[in-house]
């Protein structure tokens, strides 16, 4: 419980000397597994991934990436990445400086729904996967920049 609180998201707390996990806070980091003194917590043989999208750095328009999928399997993530390359090839601004454009700008221009349509083409998510219906980017917004 202490390792989760100090090193991660404080998803664990004790009730009657028993660790209880808050699944809404758990990010699957494994600190509980590594630090459990009794070995009661174990990692599943299955691997799951979190896919955060469209974060970018820079002075003009930085923005934090936001979760698109959580608890997705590896096969789904690979298919989504391949599909994302196809999406970029279709929608990249050929007149962008150096022929390069950050994918975040492409998604801004085409809309999240269009990106989602391309990214999920032919992808069957497991029952455990959670997909965000909308993504609202946070971060600093500079006026007139």
What positions do the PLM features span?
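Iron-sulfur cluster-binding cysteine motifs and their immediate structural context
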Residues: 1-21, 31-48
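Flexible, glycine/charged-enriched surface loops at secondary-structure junctions
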Residues: 90-107, 125-134
């Amino acid at each position: 419980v202490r390792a989760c609180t100090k090193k991660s998201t404080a998803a664990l707390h004790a009730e009657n000397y028993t660790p209880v996990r808050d699944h809404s806070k758990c990010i699957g980091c494994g600190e509980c597994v590594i630090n459990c003194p009794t070995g009661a917590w174990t990692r599943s043989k299955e691997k799951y991934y979190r896919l955060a999208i469209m974060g970018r750095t820079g002075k003009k328009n930085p923005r934090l990436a936001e979760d698109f999928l959580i608890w997705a399997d590896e096969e789904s993530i690979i298919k989504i990445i391949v599909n994302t390359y196809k999406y970029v090839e279709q929608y990249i601004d050929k007149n962008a400086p150096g022929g390069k454009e950050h994918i975040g700008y492409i998604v801004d221009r085409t809309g999240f729904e269009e990106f989602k349509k391309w990214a999920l083409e032919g992808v069957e998510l497991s029952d455990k996967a959670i997909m965000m219906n909308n993504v609202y980017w946070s971060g600093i917004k500079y006026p007139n920049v």
